[in-house]
């Protein structure tokens, strides 16, 4: 039986599920950009791409060389195809305007070009996270300047989301709103090949991911909940839990999509004005879309992530996502 490439899968989606052709082409362009980023990441010290730029992004984070390289790869790959009205990146202060010499399309692309970039220099997994939204009609005019408001749509408005993870294999994990598929990069073919047909997160789990070094800064519901996890069989949950932490959301969520688990990045007391560290538009929304499509759940401790109305491109949120039973439990603790 012939293998199903990403291109073939997308063509079949266009035929059977009426996936628009321009969305198909957009996903293929993003996938090609991810292959290029994968190649750059794999060079490491040989390609002179390790280390920092000595600059900070809008988040106040020091930019790694590969952050900037990955951002440029995605911009250059997607600006000319005629599928997009604009782009927004975690690495850029403002929305990216499609140059006037290129046609405008019907979609908006939002991305974190290299999630977990602190892992680059130690050769640990990193990835690219992306989300696709429809552009509001008032911004579709070729002459209409695009501003931040066009992007400020709740996660329920996403038409596609996914990530590429650059680890021992390069994988692209994708949802078009009809389940979650996983594609592995066959470097001999140069194509992403369908290897994970229907990714599903089990409802229960005995594994969680959180940065325990921040424990002293957590709110009481999180302290209580993690204490119960750590208490094991003798505690109120009556079972033992393992903890995992890769320090890259894309890697931790990939593990959860593969075998279940709970990912937590809660609000902490060090910066009370910021409701969390992770970005709603670039990280929380696309990952929440994927997790829900795989049968899991995702909240900020109080409400469903996908229902949050964004107020800014770089808005931050607390995140609890993964196996449904544990997400519901920790969310309930926040409401008591």
Curated annotation (Swiss-Prot):
Pathway: Carbohydrate biosynthesis; gluconeogenesis. It catalyses: beta-D-fructose 1,6-bisphosphate + H2O = beta-D-fructose 6-phosphate + phosphate. InterPro entries: FBPase_C_dom, FBPase_class-1, FBPase_N, FBPtase. GO terms for biological process: fructose 1,6-bisphosphate metabolic process; fructose 6-phosphate metabolic process; fructose metabolic process; gluconeogenesis; sucrose biosynthetic process. It is an enzyme of class 3 (hydrolase). Mg(2+) 2 binds at residues 112, 115, 283. The keyword Cytoplasm applies. GO terms for molecular function: fructose 1,6-bisphosphate 1-phosphatase activity; magnesium ion binding. Mg(2+) 1 binds at residues 90, 112, 114. Binds 2 magnesium ions per subunit. Substrate binds at residues 115-118, 211, 277. Keywords: Carbohydrate metabolism, Cytoplasm, Hydrolase, Magnesium, Metal-binding. GO terms for cellular component: cytosol. Its cofactor is Mg(2+). It is found in: Cytoplasm. Its EC number is 3.1.3.11. Belongs to the FBPase class 1 family. Homotetramer. NCBIfam families: PRK09293.1-3, PRK09293.1-4. This is Fructose-1,6-bisphosphatase class 1. It comes from Pseudomonas fluorescens (strain SBW25).
């Amino acid at each position: 039986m012939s293998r199903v490439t990403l291109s073939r899968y997308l063509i079949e989606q266009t035929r059977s599920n009426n996936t628009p052709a321009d969305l198909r082409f957009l996903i293929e362009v993003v996938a090609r950009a991810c292959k290029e980023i994968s190649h750059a990441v794999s060079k490491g010290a040989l390609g002179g791409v390790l280390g920092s730029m000595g600059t900070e992004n809008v988040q106040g984070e020091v930019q790694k060389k590969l952050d900037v390289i990955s951002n440029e790869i995605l911009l250059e790959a997607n600006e000319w195809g005629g599928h997009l009205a604009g782009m927004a990146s975690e690495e850029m202060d403002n929305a990216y305007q499609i140059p006037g010499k290129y046609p405008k399309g019907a979609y908006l692309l939002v991305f974190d070009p290299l999630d977990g970039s602190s892992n680059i220099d130690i050769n640990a997994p990193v990835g690219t996270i992306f989300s696709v939204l429809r552009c509001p009609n008032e911004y579709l005019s070729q002459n209409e300047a695009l501003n931040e408001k066009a992007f400020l749509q709740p996660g329920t408005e996403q038409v596609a989301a996914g990530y590429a993870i650059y680890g021992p294999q390069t994988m692209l994990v994708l949802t078009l709103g009809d389940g979650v598929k996983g594609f592995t990069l066959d470097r001999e073919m140069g194509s992403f090949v369908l290897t994970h047909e229907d990714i599903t997160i089990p409802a229960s789990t005995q594994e969680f991911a959180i940065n325990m070094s921040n424990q002293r800064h957590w709110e009481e519901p999180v302290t209580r909940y993690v204490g119960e996890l750590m208490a094991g069989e003798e505690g109120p949950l009556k079972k033992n839990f393992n903890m995992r932490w890769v320090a890259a959301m894309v890697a931790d969520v990939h593990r959860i999509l593969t075998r279940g688990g709970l990912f937590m990045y809660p609000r902490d007391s060090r910066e009370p004005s910021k409701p969390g560290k992770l970005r709603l538009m670039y990280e929380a929304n696309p990952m929440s879309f994927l997790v829900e499509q795989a049968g899991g759940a995702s909240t900020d401790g109080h409400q469903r992530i996908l229902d949050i109305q964004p107020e800014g491109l770089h808005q931050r949120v607390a995140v609890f996502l993964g196996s449904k039973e544990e997400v519901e439990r920790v969310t309930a603790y926040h409401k008591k």
